[in-house]
Structure formats: C-alpha cells, structure tokens
Amino acid sequence: MNKLANQHLIWIDLEMTGLDPNQDRIIEIATIVTDKDLNILAKGPVLAVHQPNTLLSKMNEWCIKTHTANGLIERVKQSKLTERAAELQTLDFLKQWVMKGSSPICGNSVAQDKRFLYQYMPDLADYFHYRHLDVSTLKELARRWKPEILQQFSKKNSHLALDDIRESIEELKFYREHFIKLA
C-alpha cells in the first residue's frame, strides 16, 4: 500500500430491517474505495446478510415493500453469511486499499450506518477515522442555501447498498461542481 492510500476514501452503505440498532439488524453491506478526487479505485464485496424469518417478519411496511421489490429479502433468505462473516470479508477488502484509521466513513446519512456498525460489526466500525464524510450534510445545506440546484440531481433510490454508494459518490461530485466553490 502506498502513501496515497492514506487519502483514499471508504464509501459504505448498509441496508437494515429498520432504523433502531437495538432491535433491527443489517441485511446488506457494500463498500467502494475512491481516491480523494472521487474516482472509483475498487468495488468491495456486496453481501446479503442472513437474518431469520422471525426478524424479517417484524420489518415495517416500507421495508417489506422496498426490499421485496428490489429482491433483497430473497437474497437475505438465501444467504448463509452472518454479520461477522460479512464484517470480516469487508475488512479483508479494505485492508488492501486503505490504512486503518485514515479514512472517514463516507456516504449518505452515515451516522445511522455507524450506529449499526458499532452494534453488529464493531471491528469494522473501528477501522474508520473518527470523522464522517456525509453527503447528506451538503444536501441539507443546499436545501437551505441554494434549493434550486436540488432539481438538477435525481437519485434512483433502489435501496440496494452498492447502488446507493454509487449515487452518493455521484451526488458529492454534483455538489462539488455546482455548490462548493473550490477556487
């Protein structure tokens, strides 16, 4: 790993059975590594995490509808992966690209993902720098300071982890070009 790896960014997204890490669980995890300029360097494993039917049946209507339509529930039922196995596969990938503690967690609403990581994938949670690079912060600022630009960027909202990461990277590129003045 070269010195530039210290500037690489880890993009992560989780899909969960709900929003409460005390009762809900992770059902999908994906990662992408970019350079500091947001060019994709590597796509990590995209992993459906097995959860029992008793847990899946407790999901709210939005989760059931969304994750049935996108095929995730079926992938979760077919999966044999535990959260720990998914965590270890993700860490094995990240260790090839980014030094521990050098990258913030990157994505949209990453504080929510981090809550689940601390609960169910603590070794992965500890791999990140303590800072966050949260694209949703820029979205909220644009909504307040320059709302007209929000109509120029649309997301598919497939609610599949890898798609969501790619959209987050593209969204940050959009804000860099149309919202943040870098000169």
Swiss-Prot record:
Primary location class: cytoplasm
GO cellular component terms, A-Z: cytoplasm
NCBIfam families: PRK05359.1
Catalytic residue list: 130
Protein family per UniProt: Belongs to the oligoribonuclease family.
InterPro entries named among the record's database cross-references: Exonuclease_RNaseT/DNA_pol3, Oligoribonuclease, RNaseH-like_sf, RNaseH_sf
Record's protein name: Oligoribonuclease
Source species of the chain: Haemophilus ducreyi (strain 35000HP / ATCC 700724)
Localisation per UniProt entry: Cytoplasm
BP term (GO), one: DNA metabolic process
Coiled coil: none
